Design a protein with these regions (language model features):
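...captures the hydrophobic TM-helix bundle architecture rather than a specific catalytic motif
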Residues: 1-259
């Protein structure tokens, strides 16, 4: 299952396009910009189709189980007393943060660069990469005579990377990273014509509203970590279904509303 095992390439492709525009965009011809940025998103869409196709086979063999691919762990796992200690992961020493949950359980805080594919994320993956590819293709003509052509496509590629990270993240921390990236790109794209006062004002308004959403997201994330002792979607879902937590608990309701 080459597509599933390399699902991390889907967000990486537009990220590479954005990085290329950042460092070399000024020197590139429009044709080259189109090949790099539009090509990256089209490849991401084709790769997404392959990944979803292979996921259908995976789901038949593992009904109800999402596919997860953990690329790197920057906060390790383990058990022990509350505090900070190192843990070995992949031959490297990773920081390990252990805290007490609401019911007094010691819980290691886990944060991965990991990706998850399930029926819901599969639908959104195809939608975002497919529509994103069409937007990129349309923009090659719509923005053809605009100053800052490379900058616009750099923003679009960065937006695709952030949105795909948000969709495929297997934990709340990485999802928050994607959310922040989407907010940043919204600000950059809305304010693309920064010399126009109306565009600058609209971009600032969007930035402020997103920061309000960030506060709620963070509070909801911290509440889930404190209540369940985990930030991975699969573990939180398993604990929620275990029967040890009351569905009508005001804390769960509050965390849901904050998110």
């Amino acid at each position: 299952m080459v597509f599933l095992s390399h699902i991390w390439l889907i967000p990486l492709l537009p990220a590479l396009g954005a990085a290329t525009m950042l460092f070399f965009g000024r020197k590139l011809q429009k044709t080259t910009i189109n090949v790099v940025c539009v090509g990256a998103v089209i490849l991401a869409f084709l790769f997404a189709c392959g990944a979803v196709w292979q996921y259908t086979d995976y789901s038949r063999a593992n009904p109800g189980k999402p596919y997860q691919n953990i690329v790197y762990t920057w906060l390790g796992t383990g058990s022990g007393e509350t505090g900070v200690s190192p843990v070995q992961s992949g031959g490297e020493t990773q920081p390990q943060i252990i805290f007490l949950t609401r019911d007094g359980r010691p819980a290691p805080l886990q944060a991965d660069a990991g990706f998850l594919l399930d029926p819901l994320s599969s639908i959104w993956l195809l939608f975002v990469t497919g529509v994103g590819a069409l937007i990129h293709i349309y923009s090659t003509g719509y923005m053809a005579h605009e100053h800052g052509y490379y900058r616009f496509f750099g923003y679009l590629n960065l937006f695709m990377f952030s949105m795909l990270t948000l969709i495929l993240a297997n934990n709340y921390v990485l999802m928050f990273v994607g959310w922040e990236g989407v907010g940043l790109c919204s600000y950059l794209l809305i304010g693309f014509y920064f010399h126009r006062p109306s565009a600058s004002t609209a971009a600032n308004k969007a930035f402020i509203v997103n920061r309000i959403g960030d506060a709620g997201f963070l509070l909801g994330m911290f509440t889930i970590a404190w209540y369940f002792g985990s930030l991975r979607f699969s573990e939180v879902t398993h604990l929620a279904r275990s029967g040890h937590f009351a569905i009508g608990d005001p804390i769960i309701t509050a965390a849901t509303l904050l998110l």
